[in-house]
Amino acid sequence: MKLHHPPADLETTKSSIEGEKRVRVLLAEDDRALRRFLEVVLERAGYEVIPASDGLEAMKLALTNEVDIVITDAMMPNLNGHELCRFLRNSQTLAHVPVILLSALEQKETDLSPEHADAFLAKPVSSETLVECIEKLLGPVSSRQ
Protein backbone atom coordinates (compact mmCIF):
# COMPACT_ATOMS: atom_id res chain seq x y z
CA MET A 1 0.00 0.00 0.00
CA LYS A 2 1.49 3.31 -1.09
CA LEU A 3 0.61 6.27 1.11
CA HIS A 4 1.51 9.91 0.57
CA HIS A 5 1.73 12.54 3.27
CA PRO A 6 0.54 16.00 2.16
CA PRO A 7 2.79 18.99 2.82
CA ALA A 8 1.71 21.16 5.72
CA ASP A 9 -0.25 24.21 4.56
CA LEU A 10 1.13 27.36 6.18
CA GLU A 11 -2.17 29.26 5.95
CA THR A 12 -4.06 26.37 7.52
CA THR A 13 -1.47 26.07 10.28
CA LYS A 14 -1.56 29.83 10.88
CA SER A 15 -5.36 29.93 11.13
CA SER A 16 -5.33 26.95 13.49
CA ILE A 17 -2.84 28.71 15.75
CA GLU A 18 -4.98 31.85 15.74
CA GLY A 19 -7.86 29.80 17.17
CA GLU A 20 -10.32 29.75 14.28
CA LYS A 21 -12.89 26.95 14.39
CA ARG A 22 -11.70 23.98 12.38
CA VAL A 23 -13.89 21.40 10.68
CA ARG A 24 -14.36 18.42 13.01
CA VAL A 25 -13.94 15.03 11.35
CA LEU A 26 -15.14 11.87 13.08
CA LEU A 27 -12.83 9.13 11.79
CA ALA A 28 -13.90 5.51 12.36
CA GLU A 29 -11.23 2.97 11.36
CA ASP A 30 -10.38 -0.27 13.14
CA ASP A 31 -6.87 -0.61 11.66
CA ARG A 32 -4.73 1.35 14.12
CA ALA A 33 -1.90 2.15 11.68
CA LEU A 34 -4.28 3.35 8.96
CA ARG A 35 -6.33 5.34 11.49
CA ARG A 36 -3.17 7.10 12.69
CA PHE A 37 -2.04 7.80 9.10
CA LEU A 38 -5.44 9.27 8.23
CA GLU A 39 -5.38 11.38 11.41
CA VAL A 40 -2.03 12.88 10.35
CA VAL A 41 -3.27 13.51 6.79
CA LEU A 42 -6.42 15.23 8.04
CA GLU A 43 -4.65 17.29 10.72
CA ARG A 44 -2.05 18.49 8.19
CA ALA A 45 -4.92 19.53 5.92
CA GLY A 46 -6.33 21.68 8.73
CA TYR A 47 -9.05 19.43 10.15
CA GLU A 48 -9.67 18.53 13.78
CA VAL A 49 -9.92 14.74 14.08
CA ILE A 50 -11.99 12.72 16.54
CA PRO A 51 -10.74 9.12 16.17
CA ALA A 52 -12.79 5.98 16.82
CA SER A 53 -11.59 2.37 16.68
CA ASP A 54 -14.96 0.90 15.63
CA GLY A 55 -18.48 1.84 14.64
CA LEU A 56 -19.93 1.61 18.14
CA GLU A 57 -17.34 4.03 19.51
CA ALA A 58 -17.98 6.32 16.52
CA MET A 59 -21.71 6.26 17.23
CA LYS A 60 -21.12 7.30 20.85
CA LEU A 61 -18.68 10.04 19.79
CA ALA A 62 -21.14 11.36 17.19
CA LEU A 63 -23.77 11.70 19.90
CA THR A 64 -21.46 13.53 22.33
CA ASN A 65 -19.43 15.73 19.96
CA GLU A 66 -20.32 18.27 17.32
CA VAL A 67 -18.99 16.82 14.05
CA ASP A 68 -19.01 18.28 10.55
CA ILE A 69 -18.26 15.11 8.59
CA VAL A 70 -17.81 11.39 9.25
CA ILE A 71 -15.25 9.16 7.54
CA THR A 72 -15.83 5.48 8.25
CA ASP A 73 -14.40 2.15 7.27
CA ALA A 74 -17.06 -0.15 5.82
CA MET A 75 -15.98 -3.29 7.65
CA MET A 76 -15.39 -2.89 11.40
CA PRO A 77 -16.18 -4.86 14.53
CA ASN A 78 -19.15 -4.08 16.81
CA LEU A 79 -20.91 -1.81 14.30
CA ASN A 80 -19.81 -1.65 10.67
CA GLY A 81 -19.68 1.46 8.50
CA HIS A 82 -22.98 0.71 6.76
CA GLU A 83 -24.75 0.35 10.11
CA LEU A 84 -23.11 3.56 11.34
CA CYS A 85 -24.36 5.37 8.21
CA ARG A 86 -27.87 4.05 8.78
CA PHE A 87 -27.76 5.21 12.41
CA LEU A 88 -26.59 8.71 11.38
CA ARG A 89 -29.25 9.01 8.66
CA ASN A 90 -31.99 8.02 11.11
CA SER A 91 -30.81 10.45 13.79
CA GLN A 92 -32.73 13.71 14.01
CA THR A 93 -29.59 15.63 15.00
CA LEU A 94 -27.03 13.87 12.77
CA ALA A 95 -28.87 13.12 9.51
CA HIS A 96 -27.37 16.21 7.83
CA VAL A 97 -23.74 15.18 8.51
CA PRO A 98 -21.97 14.03 5.31
CA VAL A 99 -20.46 10.53 5.42
CA ILE A 100 -17.52 9.15 3.44
CA LEU A 101 -17.34 5.36 3.36
CA LEU A 102 -13.90 3.72 2.96
CA SER A 103 -13.59 0.12 1.80
CA ALA A 104 -11.03 -2.29 0.43
CA LEU A 105 -13.89 -3.90 -1.50
CA GLU A 106 -14.83 -2.44 -4.86
CA GLN A 107 -18.10 -0.53 -4.99
CA LYS A 108 -19.60 1.91 -7.47
CA GLU A 109 -20.84 5.35 -6.46
CA THR A 110 -24.18 4.37 -7.98
CA ASP A 111 -24.45 1.58 -5.38
CA LEU A 112 -24.75 4.15 -2.60
CA SER A 113 -28.29 4.62 -1.40
CA PRO A 114 -29.52 7.79 0.36
CA GLU A 115 -29.54 6.07 3.75
CA HIS A 116 -25.86 5.35 3.35
CA ALA A 117 -22.79 7.39 2.56
CA ASP A 118 -22.52 10.59 0.54
CA ALA A 119 -19.26 9.36 -1.02
CA PHE A 120 -17.31 6.14 -1.40
CA LEU A 121 -13.52 5.85 -1.55
CA ALA A 122 -11.62 2.64 -2.22
CA LYS A 123 -8.65 1.75 -0.03
CA PRO A 124 -5.85 2.48 -0.25
CA VAL A 125 -6.92 6.10 -0.55
CA SER A 126 -4.40 8.84 -1.27
CA SER A 127 -4.30 11.88 0.98
CA GLU A 128 -5.09 14.12 -1.99
CA THR A 129 -8.18 12.10 -2.93
CA LEU A 130 -9.46 12.11 0.66
CA VAL A 131 -9.03 15.87 1.10
CA GLU A 132 -10.60 16.53 -2.33
CA CYS A 133 -13.61 14.43 -1.35
CA ILE A 134 -14.05 16.33 1.93
CA GLU A 135 -13.76 19.67 0.11
CA LYS A 136 -16.32 18.51 -2.46
CA LEU A 137 -18.79 17.76 0.34
CA LEU A 138 -18.01 20.74 2.63
CA GLY A 139 -16.13 23.28 0.51
CA PRO A 140 -12.41 24.13 0.70
CA VAL A 141 -10.81 24.95 4.06
CA SER A 142 -9.85 28.42 2.78
CA SER A 143 -13.49 29.35 2.02
CA ARG A 144 -14.58 28.57 5.60
CA GLN A 145 -12.18 31.00 7.27
Task: Indicate where each model-derived feature is located.
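Conserved acidic carboxylate
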Residues: 29
